[in-house]
A protein has these predicted regions:
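Membrane-interface alpha helices of multi-pass inner-membrane proteins
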Residues: 1-21, 137-144
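Short amphipathic alpha-helical segments embedded in low-complexity Lys/Glu-rich regions
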Residues: 6, 109, 172-173
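Hydrophobic transmembrane alpha-helices of multi-pass, membrane-embedded glycosylation machinery
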Residues: 6, 16-27, 157-162
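Short, flexible/disordered secondary-structure transition segments
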Residues: 17, 30-33, 170
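Primarily membrane-embedded glycan-assembly and transfer machineries that use lipid-linked glycans
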Residues: 22-140, 149
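Short, aromatic-rich membrane-interface segments at the entry and exit
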Residues: 130-133, 149-154, 170-175
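C-terminal multi-pass transmembrane helix bundles with aromatic-rich, positive-inside signatures
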Residues: 144, 161-180
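Hydrophobic/aromatic-rich transmembrane helices and adjacent perimembrane loops
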Residues: 149-165
Length: 180
């Protein structure tokens, strides 16, 4: 959780991986010990570690940087508010260029809720496969980030070989015979 705290200090998206990573570490903890720890206590403990690490890093930044709120605005506000609409490989810039400015805040909220909704849906549906949830969410983030980079896609593509045993099961027209 400390590494997730460091990553969340730099960007918002890693914080969305908290629930699947807690599930992954909880499953690992229950396999190692004879009795399972309390789920709410385990989650609260790890959430406290995440909050403490992010708060500690933000506190250090406040001491080091003269204009702390400028740092927060440049780090988190830039990702949340999407002020730069120059063309990039992402989808958001095109949607926001085509719409009226009066609808901008509404659609910013809709886009963020859309991306965050995958966390709950995938976690509930694929509870027994938390590593797959993390991999799938990294792919979703690579597609739906406002300012994606090649490293987002490469991280997702690097995790795909973990599931190569599922490649023959993919359903595409050329690879599967038609059975009617």
């Amino acid at each position: 959780m400390l590494a997730l705290g460091f990553a969340s200090y730099l960007s918002i998206y890693p914080a969305l991986l908290f629930i699947p990573l807690v599930l992954l570490s909880y499953d690992r903890k229950t396999q190692e010990s004879k009795h399972a720890p309390s789920t709410p206590a385990f989650t609260v403990q790890h959430f406290a570690i995440l909050l403490a690490s992010v708060a500690g890093l933000l506190g250090l930044s406040c001491l080091v940087i003269e204009d702390f709120w400028e740092f927060v605005s440049a780090t988190y506000g830039f990702q949340l508010l999407v002020p730069d609409l120059t063309p990039n490989v992402g989808l958001w810039w095109y949607f926001f260029i085509e719409m009226f400015d009066s609808f901008r805040e509404f659609f910013l909220g809709v886009f963020w809720l859309h991306m965050a909704s995958y966390v709950g849906g995938l976690t509930v549906r694929l509870r027994r496969q938390p590593l797959f949830i993390v991999s799938a969410l990294l792919g979703v983030f690579a597609i739906f980030k406002p300012y994606p980079s090649i490293s987002d896609a490469s991280l997702y593509l690097a995790l795909l070989p973990l599931y190569r045993h599922l490649f023959p099961c993919k359903s595409s027209l050329p690879s599967c015979p038609c059975r009617y």
